[in-house]
Amino acid sequence: MQVILLEPGKLGKTGDVVNVKDGYARNWLIPQGIASPATNSNMKSLEARVRSRQKIQAQEKAAAEDLASRLNGVAVELSVRAGEGKIYGAVTHQDVANSLDKLGFDVDKRRIEMPKTVKEIGEYDISYRAHPEVTIPMKLVVHAQK
């Protein structure tokens, strides 16, 4: 029996049409909501969902590229408490996100990539992954409070 996968798993990714045994499809996949029968109407609705998903992904990528053009060359400056070149604590992803928010960029702290824990004053290369295909390189400048 051919089924359309509604959830990713061992059989394939979402939207794949796969052949499985009739009993497996009727007794497990379809009742659990993991798959639906591959009928003509279901195939047409799948194609419509794929087209709408592609349109949404294209819009998200365009928004990420727009953010990349605005963030290009932005240096994030943080003033932290420090003594003898060492920071009291560490600079976190949240600190960088707050600094970017003050500059007018709404970013998700989970998408900020820092190569290592920042515990010293200096300049660091960081990046922001706005989209799986769009990574924005930035500079992080950490200096001591006066």
From Swiss-Prot:
NCBIfam families: L9 (TIGR00158). Signal peptide: none annotated. GO terms for biological process: translation. GO terms for molecular function: rRNA binding; structural constituent of ribosome. It holds the Pfam family Ribosomal_L9_N. It comes from the Bacteria. This is Large ribosomal subunit protein bL9. InterPro entries: Ribosomal_bL9, Ribosomal_bL9/RNase_H1_N, Ribosomal_bL9_bac/chp, Ribosomal_bL9_C, Ribosomal_bL9_C_sf, Ribosomal_bL9_N, Ribosomal_bL9_N_sf. Coiled coil: none annotated. Belongs to the bacterial ribosomal protein bL9 family. Binds to the 23S rRNA. Keywords: Ribonucleoprotein, Ribosomal protein, RNA-binding, rRNA-binding. The lineage of its organism: Bacteria, Thermotogati, Deinococcota, Deinococci, Deinococcales.
